[in-house]
A protein has these predicted regions:
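A conserved ligand/cofactor-binding region detector
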Residues: 1-753
Length: 753
């Protein structure tokens, strides 16, 4: 049966007579059928990757590519007068993640399946995700981001597990979402939910009764934790995920012949950040119910579980008040107390305890003590963990610490989102890079070939024009495609320093007004959501939106400078922005970004990086050479020293530097106040002068100079710029998540063995 006949058998009508919605549902069903054919029996050890978020993005095109059906689908639809791109628009984007943590988890699932490794995800089936972002009067507003429909990729099962929360029993329902690998196997993303969730309790944006657990538990990812009810709700969520997940793991292993004593021969459990940490005491509890004594259960769980640390920020290393756990998961507290006592027999260092003197339970500490592996996610990050942030643990367990530099799936971030570049690469180096990213290095042979360099430039220009069309259609913004597209798209956080970019743009505004024109016009594009309770982050968004209005209203400046803030940034938006980017902003304060993966996506698509020596920027710099990246700012050692000495006073920088003073004072100047809100702008102004915890001001002048150099190179040395872009593409192979997953398997999981 031909592809067309198969689709018509599903729809019951000719393709030309189908609506886009009908064709989407038919393709969804076809993908399910084909995915089921690739499910393979599990032998030996299987991975369970537990994560609070999986930012999987839309799945239709990705699945068609991985199943080898994309070109056939596009041709069959075109023959019927239909466009696959129109059908893709029908698909809602799953609201299951927020930022890099969730996107990494999604990339890892893709690579596991592509490499033929048995590995499933475990998470929650959020109804509204983080939130849907909109801008009203220059201010971020939040509302639900619904995606669940009667026909969803996540299929409801009859499998349920009891979960005890605060003395009450809830029933966790399992939903299964097929994960297809590129020419590989099909694995599963297991998502848990409650049948009792009531979406109608949400009101006034994303407000809801945080105490109605049976109705609210999986409504939102990371519910607002600005009050105690919200913080407790996060504990409820985390326990639902790990309790149901642990029961699923034990059930699947038992069905394969596991007697629980040998669990580590059947399962490898990866704890992705600290959100799933309670799986450790929960597994010990469940093994105890199955007749295994505490000491042996601890040994089994330690052999089975491994932990990935994703942060250097102390605020993100979860520490729950004991009172919360006593109230929500009283069945775990006796086990956590015993684990704390056991940890104290290994060290007298109070700072390494699980339960501290203030009765807070440190999740990361429990993870490190009672897993067999703790890994960082970039070489610099891991060294900082070993030498600074987790030094005491490293001295206690040096054999547990290892690095696994993050990666991205090239299927989504090249094949799917940049088909023009994919076709150009295949024309010159073949298609081997689809599964072996190292093959991209073959492109280096064309570094001095002007024909190839011009082809890459044409690809970038076409991608910029496509982005311009998308921005006009979705954001109602018109941009100059001859300008440098300078993009900073990532979660809004002070350590990622969107505020540094803001001050640069103000500086450029003044320079243009003074007649000092840049080497090239600049379109500065942002995409970011700020946590609803993160006031300063929302103030930064307001300042950027206000500045955008000020510049747009100034004909003298707007010819050279434009600021665009993409509303509701998500995977779909990223797939538009990344292929069109010229200059990739990776400007976090050195020592604060664990890795980053946006830097890798932009690099792969031929953008040049403007960044600090932080996270994976360090390894990108090593790969491409310092002449093919724009590095600026303090080193991590300098930053750590400045924190240790504690002598940083931003007010002194403001007083001593006219450019810094001018840029900061502009925030509360007449132009901004006329277009924005004094409360937001004044608060950000004062924050930068009196606090500036992430050291924006010491890096400001170096940033201005380095960015100016990048713009000059783009405008004045176009051939060299193109060559730099080629080198970045060619050297991106190291940052494939296939490489990352192969290293995890080699060193930590040993799957299928």
């Amino acid at each position: 049966m031909s592809f067309t006949e198969t689709l018509q058998s599903i729809t019951g009508k000719l393709l030309a007579d189908c609506t886009d919605q009908e064709l989407y549902l038919a393709l969804l069903e076809l993908v399910r059928q084909k995915s089921a054919d690739r499910v393979q029996p599990v032998t030996g050890r299987k991975l369970y990757y537990i994560s609070a978020e999986f930012l999987i993005g839309k799945l239709l095109s990705n699945n068609l590519i991985n199943l080898g059906l994309y070109d056939e689908a596009r041709s069959a639809l075109a023959a019927a007068g239909k466009r696959l791109s129109d059908i893709e628009e029908v698909e809602p984007e799953p609201s299951l993640g927020n930022g890099g943590l969730g996107r990494l988890a999604a990339c890892f699932l893709d690579s596991l399946a592509t490499l033929g490794l048995p590995g499933d995800g475990v998470g929650l089936r959020y109804h509204f995700g983080l939130f849907h972002q909109s801008f009203e009067d220059g201010v971020q507003n939040e509302k639900p981001d619904p995606w669940l429909t009667a026909h969803s990729w996540a299929e409801k099962t009859d499998i349920t597990y009891p979960v005890q929360l605060a003395g009450k029993q809830y029933t966790a329902r399992l939903y299964k979402l097929a994960v297809t690998g590129y020419e590989g196997r099909t694995n599963t993303l297991n998502l848990f939910d409650l049948d009792t969730i009531d979406e109608s309790i949400v009101h006034d944006g994303i407000a809801f009764d945080k105490t109605a657990i049976d109705k609210n538990l999986t409504l939102f990812l990371y519910p607002d934790d600005s009050d105690e009810a919200g913080r407790r709700l996060r504990v409820y969520q985390q326990y639902l995920m790990v309790s149901a997940g642990a029961q699923l793991i034990l059930a699947e292993c038992a069905a394969r012949g596991c007697n629980y004593h040998d669990l580590a021969d059947y399962a490898a459990i990866q704890i992705n950040d600290t959100h799933p940490s309670m799986v450790i005491p929960e597994l010990i509890r469940l093994l105890g119910e199955r007749g295994i004594k505490f000491e042996e259960a601890v040994e089994i769980v330690t052999k089975t579980c491994a932990y990935t640390n994703h942060t250097i920020l102390a605020e993100a290393l979860e520490k729950w008040p004991r009172a919360y756990l006593d109230a929500v998961v009283p069945q775990l507290m006796p086990i956590i107390e015993k684990l704390d006592a056991l940890a104290r027999t290994r060290t007298e260092d109070e700072s390494l305890a699980i339960i501290d003197k203030d009765d807070r339970v440190h999740m990361a500490h429990m993870d490190i003590h009672f897993t067999h592996s703790t890994n960082g996610v970039a070489a610099l990050h891991t060294e900082i963990l070993k030498n600074s942030e987790l030094h005491g643990f490293y001295e206690l367990y040096p054999e547990k610490f290892n690095n696994k530099t993050n990666g991205i799936t090239f299927r989504r971030w090249l094949l799917e989102c940049d088909p023009r570049l994919t076709a150009t690469l295949e024309k010159h180096i073949g298609s081997g890079f689809r599964k072996d990213a190292a093959e991209l290095e073959k492109l280096l042979a064309f570094a001095d070939d002007e024909t190839v360099l011009n082809e890459l430039t044409a690809v970038k220009k076409a991608n910029k024009e496509a982005l311009a069309d998308w921005l006009l259609h979705t954001q109602k913004v018109q941009v100059n495609t001859d300008a440098v597209f300078d993009i900073q798209s990532k979660r809004l956080h002070e350590y990622k320093r969107q505020q540094l970019n803001l001050l640069y743009l103000i500086h450029q505004y003044y320079e243009i007004k003074a007649g000092h024109l840049p080497a090239a016009p600049l379109v500065s594009i942002f995409g970011a959501k700020a946590a609803p309770a993160y006031t300063i982050a929302k103030d930064i968004i307001h300042a950027l939106l206000t500045l955008s209005r000020v510049i747009a209203a100034d004909p003298e400046v707007s010819k050279w400078l434009q600021v665009v803030f993409v509303e509701n940034y998500n995977v779909t938006a990223a797939e538009k922005l990344i292929p069109a980017c010229d200059l990739s902003e990776q400007i976090s304060l050195a020592s604060k970004e664990a890795s980053g993966t946006g830097n890798m996506k932009f690099m792969l698509n031929g953008a040049l990086t403007l960044g600090t020596m932080d996270g994976a920027n360090v390894e990108i710099s090593q790969q491409v050479g310092e002449e093919n990246i724009y590095i600026f700012g303090q080193t991590s050692d300098q930053v750590i020293h400045r924190y240790a000495v504690g002598d940083y006073d931003p007010a002194q920088w403001v007083e001593g530097d006219a450019n810094i003073r001018r840029a900061i004072n502009f925030l509360t100047g007449p132009e901004m106040l006329a277009a924005g809100h004094a409360e937001n702008l004044t608060r950000l102004h004062d924050e930068l002068i009196h606090k500036d915890w992430f050291q924006t001001l010491p890096d400001f002048n170096a940033y201005v100079v380095r960015k100016g150099q990048a713009l000059s190179d783009y405008a004045c040395a176009p051939l060299d710029w193109r060559r730099k872009c080629l080198v970045n593409i060619a050297k991106a192979g190291m940052f494939s998540s296939d490489r990352t997953i192969a290293e995890y398997d080699r060193d930590i999981w040993h799957l299928g063995k």
